[in-house]
Amino acid sequence: MMIHGFQSSHQDFSFGPWKLTASKTHIMKSADVEKLADELHMPSLPEMMFGDNVLRIQHGSGFGIEFNATDALRCVNNYQGMLKVACAEEWQESRTEGEHSKEVIKPYDWTYTTDYKGTLLGESLKLKVVPTTDHIDTEKLKAREQIKFFEEVLLFEDELHDHGVSSLSVKIRVMPSSFFLLLRFFLRIDGVLIRMNDTRLYHEADKTYMLREYTSRESKIANLMHVPPSLFTEPNEISQYLPIKEAVCEKLVFPERIDPNPVDSQSTPSE
C-alpha cells in the first residue's frame, strides 16, 4: 500500500515539444463522489478517490495522453460476471448503510477492476492507435541514465472493507532522450485472488510515436502456495508469479501534419 501524504502539488516538466504535468491534491468531497457515482451508475466509488489527480503528457500542438481516475472507472465492467467471494456480500452491505440502505443495489464490479490505458487528448489532432508487434526495449530501460524528472500519482485506492486492496496509480520517469510511464491497477483479495493490469508507455525523442504495452496478470491465491505470502503485498515482486491473461502492444502514432519538434525547449522542471 502506498503512504499518503495528501499534500497538494503541481509540477510541469518540458521534454522537447512535450509538456509533462503531474497534479496531486486531496480526495474528492463526499458530495462530488455521490454525483460521480450516479453518473457512472455505480453504488459507490473507491474509499480514496482522487478525482482531480492527473498525469498528462501533451505535445505543443495539443495532442497527447493523460491518466485520471474518472476515465479509469468508466472502463470498469459492471455487467460481466462478478467475483463470487466470501467477503463480497459483507462488503456490499457495509457500503449500503445509511441514507441509501433501502435502495436496490445493482450488480457492479466492487473490485473496481479497470483495463484503462489512458485518455487521448486533442480535437483535430490526436494520436493514432495502431497495433504492432514491436515491444518496449527493456534493456534500454535498464541502462544507467540520469533521471531528469520523476513523479508518481495515486488515482484511487480502496481496502475492500479490510479484505485486501484495489488501487490505481501512475508514475513517470524522464531520461535525457526518452520517457517511460507505468500505469498500474493492483487488486488483492485476501485468500482469494491477485490481479494486476499494467500499461507501459515509452517514447524516444527521435521517434514519431510512443509504444504502449498493456498486460493483464492474474492468479488465485490457491495457486500461489509456493510463493512467500509476504510478496502478496508487493506488486513489483509478485508480478513474476502471475500468469499473463492478456497482452496488447500498440503504437501511438503522432499526427502527420505536425513538426515533431515545434519548439526548442529545454528539459527543465517548474513548480
Curated annotation (Swiss-Prot):
Q: Which InterPro entries match?
A: Phosphatase_reg/MetRdx, TIP41-like
Q: Which residues carry this modification: Phosphoserine?
A: S265, S270
Q: Does the keyword NAD apply?
A: no
**Matches recorded under Pfam families:** TIP41 (PF04176)
Could you tell me which residues carry N6-acetyllysine? K106
The annotated region (Interaction with PPP2CA) lies at 173-271
Q: Which cysteines are joined by disulfide bonds?
A: none
Show the GO MF annotations: protein phosphatase inhibitor activity
Q: Name one GO biological process term.
A: DNA damage checkpoint signaling
State the UniProt keywords alphabetically. Acetylation, Cytoplasm, Phosphoprotein
Provide a GO CC annotation, any one: cytoplasm
Primary localization: cytoplasm
Location relative to the cell: Cytoplasm
| Quaternary structure and partners | Interacts with PPP2CA. Interacts with PPP2CB, PPP4C and PPP6C. Interacts with IGBP1; the interaction is dependent on PPP2CA. Associates with a protein phosphatase 2A PP2A(C):IGBP1 complex. Interacts with PPP4C and PPP4R2.
Q: What does the function comment of this entry state?
A: May be a allosteric regulator of serine/threonine-protein phosphatase 2A (PP2A). Inhibits catalytic activity of the PP2A(D) core complex in vitro. The PP2A(C):TIPRL complex does not show phosphatase activity. May play a role in the regulation of ATM/ATR signaling pathway controlling DNA replication and repair.
Extract the PANTHER family matched here: GAF/PUTATIVE CYTOSKELETAL PROTEIN, TIP41-LIKE PROTEIN
Q: Could you say which protein family the record assigns here?
A: Belongs to the TIP41 family.
Supply the name of the protein.
TIP41-like protein
The record's gene field reads: Tiprl
